[in-house]
Amino acid sequence: WGDIGVEVPGCKNNEIVVVSRQNNSDTYAYFKKAVLGAKGKYRQGTLDMHGSKDVVDLVEKTPCAIGYSGLAYATDHIKMACIDKADGGDCVSPSVGTASDRSYPIARPLFMYTNGEPKGEIKKYLDWIHSEEGQCIILGKGYASVRDL
């Protein structure tokens, strides 16, 4: 942290502890592509966690740590990074709003797929997800609302 001019309270040796997801995670793959680029590589020595909640928990407990996770896993006990846009514009803080309007540069959509046109119980479930009740639950869990693409 000291090399980039940042003082982190409680971080005694100023060494950045990088917390990541395991390489079989879609979150890992998306972050790698969106942030590190097609040929980018994670550095050696990352602490690879099983799930997003595990990443957030470790970052919260480790003063020198930095990590990435889905917005729905954010807590009041960690600081979320404001990310610069590729065009050099002002940085954008992560929120449901900036994920929904796609202004947060590393927000990603989540998709649900069906084998053919949904029918029966699957159609009922998808209709419920798009309903006001379903959308309230999605927003309450920290995810952006569902949009038809």
Predicted regions and their residues:
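Flexible loop/hinge segments at secondary-structure junctions
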Residues: 1-149
